[in-house]
Amino acid sequence: MRAHTGRPGEVAVTAANPRRQARILLIVENVSLARDHRLQKQVTTLISNGYGVEVICRRDPGNHEWDGARVHEYRAPADAGSKLGFVREYGHSWVMAAWLTAKVFITERFDAMQVSGTPDIYFTIGTPFKLLGRPLVLDQRDLSPELYEVRYGRRDGIVYRALCWLERATYRAADHVITVNGSLEQVAYTRGKVPPGDVTVVGNGPVVERTCKRPPRLELKHGRRFLCCWLGLMGPQDRMDVALRAIDHLVNVIGRTDCHFAFVGDGETRSAACQLAKELGIQDWVSFPGWAKEDDAFTYLSTADVGLEPNLEEIVSPVKGMEYMAFGLPFVAFDLKETRALAGEAAAYATPGDVTGFAELIDRLLDDSPRRAEMGKIGRQLFEERLSWNRQEGPYLEVYRRLLSRRRRNRLSRKSD
């Protein structure tokens, strides 16, 4: 375990003590700051607006790149595949996060805490500090019961019921809930019984200034005319298997052999995806370059002709889609509520689960350069006007202004009594 810090940001006073910089503790579950783009944006926004920032996360050499944030790291547990393995993995992360939280409170203090991750177990770390007047913010990106269903194909059993209970307990414990889209906002209000006004939607688009197009690198096309790109973390819910089966249909049934497909990223399903590509006989058309730093990842998007988003989760806003749109890259997706709400005419939609239809849409887009250009233009405009992180910073900062202001009023009220 170790901590490191960079240059301090401009000073913002705490609501509890006007002479001290307000400090926010951000805890992410079993992931590093270097791999969590949303966390990176939140850290940068808070620092640039005068907050002190403490981060608790998994150890990663890339964590050292964020000046102004004090990062408290713990050794990453071994990745698990079984249910028991997941208990060990996340149990280790919870113990380390709890210990580091207590250490930070004693040595640095903090004025508010934000937790994020699935399963919903970190509210148990924040609850004791609520008794000390530190508000707890839940940054909800996914729904644990739904992720369990995607992974194991069931909505029953003791584990599923436990996840539902943990979700309800987390909603009850949170002083404010941040969600990534309107569907999760409604879940918080209906399933979570969160009081009106205590949920804020903060999207997850890239920062405008970081999305300037890079010079295309034709070698990424591996000698072929076109490049299709998939970008992101590789988990069961991302359905890389669906994308690979669509590529199989495109190459081996339709006969399209002038396109290369790059799956850029890393995660627990990468090795299985590589094996599936070999089994389908499409390994000559597919590459898995691994995790890429931002500039390299964005070079792929600047070079690509079509993006791929095979996710089948109805209420998830696809981060991939926002990144594709930021670079004017049209993409193929399944016709799901939040995907269509996000992208509109910037994407082409197949019936959910229709692998053949997904492949046919890729084929048509590759043959229609004017349509690709128009879709890309629409996507970039939507990104700039509505989806970019620049548009999310205001609502995000308002959450902390509101909570710290309330905390100050409560302290003044107790003093007057």
Language-model region placement:
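Acidic donor-binding loop of glycosyltransferase active sites
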Residues: 175, 298-316, 329
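Carbohydrate-associated surface elements
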Residues: 183, 205
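Membrane-proximal helix-turn-helix segments that form the acceptor-binding/catalytic region
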Residues: 44, 102, 124, 128-132, ...
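Conserved donor-binding/catalytic core segment of Leloir-type glycosyltransferases
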Residues: 25, 178, 219-247, 262
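N-terminal subdomain of nucleotide-sugar transferases
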Residues: 2-67
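An aromatic- and histidine-rich active-site surface loop
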Residues: 94-97, 110-133, 137-147, 184
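Nucleotide-activated donor-binding/catalytic signature segment of Leloir-type glycosyltransferases, i.e.
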Residues: 271-292
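Conserved acidic donor-binding segment of nucleotide-sugar-dependent glycosyltransferases
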Residues: 347-356, 364-370
